[in-house]
Structures are given as structure tokens and as C-alpha cells.
């Protein structure tokens, strides 16, 4: 099935831009897509579209273009048109999702026997115990009984997660955003991740069968984390780079730690990609690559570069962030701690909860962040710790990193 949002991105977006605006968009996307100067010069509209589809899957790729283009006055009409086309696709998907429901309702009227779902199984069994003649004579009674069954089932259902929202995109909807009514000291612990959010992440996890050869740039020591699916476990983060791009990596198989040594060249296969981050699990394969392999310095520079805070405010909610930031202020609350990070372009709050609540650090220290997520809290974009997040403190005076060493 054709990705409708990708189709709009290319045909109604890039193809209708002049070269100047397309070049401007490529420049703004350079960090997210890992584009070198040469890539920015050579990559055409189709290539950039393919990269955006991979990096920002589903509706997120179109949202990204709208986010960048809306600040360009001459592209106002194009942005409005993109929003209209996006709305059309969302309505189309919503209609398709409703279609099976309508069919079931028709079948319940008497066109055919409905599929044995949890809801209609009770009513169909009840009808089976009523003679046909009696069914025809007491339609009102049957409707009353069906309503009673429906209410009973709904009352027996566990309450759904409040405030959770999903997008119309079928393969990569944006992360549910925190309600604007959430207080700033709300604790975002792993246990509060709803089932709906975990299902969204599962849909985003895209298997990658093609092997990729990379050089290891850095890796953290293993650390413990807790998730609703796996309970307590151990993982580590790494950054690797191929000849054309770099990857942030989550490694869930600790036995592979010896493979992730700085400057070591390895080949990775059977991995998956979730929210733009490579994930390596027990089913993945990591092997040594014993041939000459050189990565352009430009790729390494981009991989090690920390994004500017002003640039983070332009990213979509749900974006994963890595980097080294200066701590300006620390505010400890009952359930979480707000770490205010700052650079020469602005400041942003980091919401630390769970094991990252009130860590030992002070103004002037540097925080190396791994896998924190941009989320909207109180109508303001903030960095929020998740179950796979990791924060390393680099003390200002001693100029030494915290207990976790980087290879």
C-alpha cells in the first residue's frame, strides 16, 4: 500500500517548491537526516523524501515539512494545501476504520450472523435461546436486553487511559502528548506508560533485514532499567556510523558489549528501528568486519555534535534527543526533578523521574543525555526521561564523568 502521507510530501510538497526553498528545507533537515554538505548538494527531492519517510514514519514526515515550511511566508499557500491534503487522508483512514463496524451493525439487524466478538457473542447466545416466533413478537424486549448486555459489558471493562490520544496514521502516529492540564511536577515513571502507548511503539518498530557495516564511535556501560513488558533488565547505549550516516543504538543483549568498543568495525543485521533509533536484541546478529573501513570525518562530526536548544524547539513532540548540555538550575519536587539546561541559544527543562529523580549534580555541571524524549507539558516542549533514558553527570571542577564510563 502506498504511503499516502509520503505521496503528499513529494507531489504536493517538494515538487511544488522552487530550488531555493527546497535547498533551505534540506539545510534545516541536515541534522535530523545526517546530511553532509555534499549530500545537501546532491540529494534531489525523491531522495530526501525517501530519507524523511524512514526517519519520520507515517504522518510525522508530513508534519515535519509543515513545521519547517510554515515559517517561510512565501510558502504559506503550500502549507495550507498540505494541511488540507493531510486532513483528507486522515478522514479517509477514519472512514476505513469505521467500515467494519457498520457491517457488524447490519449483520446484527438480520443480514447475516455476526462474527463471535466479545460483545455480540452474549447477545447471539441469548437470541439462540428465544424461539423465532417469539423474536418477531417482542422486538422491543430484544432491544432492551441488548442494551442491558451492552451496559453490563461496558461497566465490566477496565477504564481506559485518560488523556491518551492516537493519530490517524496507520504506521507511525505521533506520540500521545501530555495534557496541558498536567502539573509541571507530574512524575513520568515507566509504570505510567499506558497500554495504548506501548501498542503505538510496537507499530513503530520496523524490522530491518539488510545488514549494515558501521564503526563504533562510543558506548556507555550497561545500566539497569525497568519496562512493563520485560520487567527489570539491563541494556546500554551506543553511537555508530556507516559511510553515509550515523545511528544512535539501544543494545538489549549485554553479551554484545565486547563488540561495541570504540573504533571497532562491526556488521549488524536483523535489527529494528523505532523512532529513528536502532534497536539490537537477542535475535539480532553482530559480527566483526575484518576489512578496511573508513567513515568520512563529516559523518563523525555530525554524530558527536550536540543539537542547539533553539533547534530542539523546532522538533516534533516525540523526537528522541541525545547530547551534552550545561546545567543551569536544579529544582527538586516531590515526584520529579526539573533540570534546566542551557546553551547560547536558549534553555529547556529536563523532567527527571524514577532513578533520574534528584541525581547528584549542581549548577555548572554538564549532563550527557541519552534517549530523552521531547514532550509537550503545560503547553511547553520539555525533555522527559523514559524507561530507556540515561543521564551521565560530568562534574564542572574535576572534569570527570559520573560512574558510567564511555569507551
From Swiss-Prot:
GO terms for biological process: activation of innate immune response; B cell receptor signaling pathway; cellular defense response; cellular response to interferon-beta; DNA damage response; negative regulation of B cell proliferation; positive regulation of apoptotic process. GO terms for cellular component: azurophil granule lumen; cytosol; extracellular exosome; extracellular region; ficolin-1-rich granule lumen; intracellular membrane-bounded organelle; nucleolus; nucleoplasm. Residues 177-190 have a biased composition (Low complexity). PROSITE patterns: DAPIN, HIN_200. Residues 1-88 form the Pyrin domain. Coiled coil: none annotated. Residues 108-207 are annotated as: Disordered. Gene3D superfamilies: Death Domain, Fas, Nucleic acid-binding proteins. It is found in: Nucleus; Cytoplasm. Its main location: nucleus. Expressed constitutively in cells of the myeloid lineage. Found in promyelocyte stage cells as well as in all other stage cells including peripheral blood monocytes and granulocytes. Also appears in myeloblast cells in some cases of acute myeloid Leukemia. One of its GO terms (molecular function) is double-stranded DNA binding. Induction: Strongly induced by alpha interferon which selectively affects expression in late stage cells in the monocytic but not the granulocytic lineage. Induced in vitro by dimethylsulfoxide and 1,25 dihydroxyvitamin D3. A motif (Nuclear localization signal) lies at residues 131-137. Residues 196-394 form the HIN-200 domain. Keywords: Activator, Cytoplasm, DNA-binding, Nucleus, Repressor, Transcription, Transcription regulation. It comes from the Eukaryota. Residues 139-148 have a biased composition (Basic and acidic residues). Participates in a ternary complex with YY1 and the YY1 target DNA element. Binds nucleolin and nucleophosmin/NPM/B23. Its N-terminal half (200 amino acids) is sufficient for maximum enhancement of YY1 DNA binding and a portion of this sequence is responsible for binding YY1. May act as a transcriptional activator/repressor in the myeloid lineage. Plays a role in the granulocyte/monocyte cell-specific response to interferon. Stimulates the DNA binding of the transcriptional repressor protein YY1. This is Myeloid cell nuclear differentiation antigen. The gene is MNDA.
Amino acid at each position: 500500500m502506498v504511503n499516502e502521507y509520503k505521496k503528499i510530501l513529494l507531489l504536493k510538497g517538494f515538487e511544488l517548491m522552487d530550488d531555493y526553498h527546497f535547498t533551505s528545507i534540506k539545510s534545516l533537515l541536515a541534522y535530523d537526516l545526517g546530511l553532509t554538505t555534499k549530500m545537501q548538494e546532491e540529494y534531489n527531492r525523491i531522495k530526501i523524501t525517501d530519507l524523511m519517510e524512514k526517519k519520520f514514519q507515517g504522518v510525522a514526515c508530513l508534519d515535519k515539512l509543515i513545521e519547517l515550511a510554515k515559517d517561510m511566508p512565501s510558502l504559506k499557500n503550500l502549507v495550507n494545501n498540505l494541511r488540507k491534503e493531510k486532513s483528507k487522508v486522515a478522514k479517509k483512514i477514519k472512514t476505513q476504520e469505521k467500515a467494519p463496524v457498520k457491517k457488524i451493525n447490519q449483520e446484527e439487524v438480520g443480514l447475516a450472523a455476526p462474527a463471535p466478538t466479545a460483545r455480540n457473542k452474549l447477545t447471539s447466545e441469548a437470541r439462540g435461546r428465544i424461539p423465532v416466533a417469539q423474536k418477531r413478537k417482542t422486538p422491543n424486549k430484544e432491544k432492551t436486553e441488548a442494551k442491558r448486555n451492552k451496559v453490563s459489558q461496558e461497566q465490566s471493562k477496565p477504564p481506559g487511559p485518560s488523556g491518551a490520544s492516537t493519530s490517524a496514521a496507520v504506521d507511525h502516529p505521533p506520540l500521545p502528548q501530555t495534557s496541558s492540564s498536567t502539573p509541571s511536577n507530574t512524575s513520568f515513571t515507566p509504570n505510567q506508560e499506558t497500554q495504548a502507548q506501548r501498542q503505538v511503539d510496537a507499530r513503530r518498530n520496523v524490522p530491518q533485514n539488510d545488514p549494515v557495516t558501521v564503526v563504533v564511535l562510543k558506548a556507555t556501560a550497561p545500566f539497569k532499567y525497568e519496562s512493563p513488558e520485560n520487567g527489570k533488565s539491563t541494556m546500554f547505549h551506543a553511537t555508530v556510523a556507516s559511510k553515509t550516516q550515523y545511528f544512535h543504538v539501544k543494545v538489549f543483549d549485554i553479551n554484545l558489549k565486547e563488540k561495541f568498543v570504540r573504533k571497532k568495525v562491526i556488521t549488524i543485521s536483523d535489527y529494528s528501528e523505532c523512532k529513528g533509533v536502532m534497536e539490537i536484541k537477542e535475535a539480532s546478529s553482530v559480527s566483526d568486519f575484518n576489512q578496511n573501513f573508513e567513515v568520512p570525518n563529516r559523518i563523525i562530526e555530525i554524530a558527536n555534535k550536540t543539537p542547539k536548544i533553539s533547534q530542539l524547539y523546532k522538533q516534533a513532540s516525540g523526537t528522541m534527543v541525545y547530547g551534552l548540555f550545561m546545567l543551569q538550575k536544579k529544582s527538586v519536587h516531590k515526584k520529579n526533578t526539573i533540570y534546566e539546561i542551557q546553551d547560547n541559544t536558549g534553555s529547556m527543562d529536563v523532567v527527571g523521574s524514577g532513578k533520574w529523580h534528584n541525581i547528584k549534580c549542581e549548577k555548572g555541571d554538564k549532563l550527557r543525555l541519552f534517549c530523552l524524549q521531547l514532550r509537550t507539558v503545560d503547553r511547553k516542549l520539555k525533555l522527559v526521561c523514559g524507561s530507556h533514558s540515561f543521564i551521565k553527570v560530568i562534574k564542572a571542577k574535576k572534569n570527570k564523568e559520573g560512574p558510567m564510563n564511555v569507551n
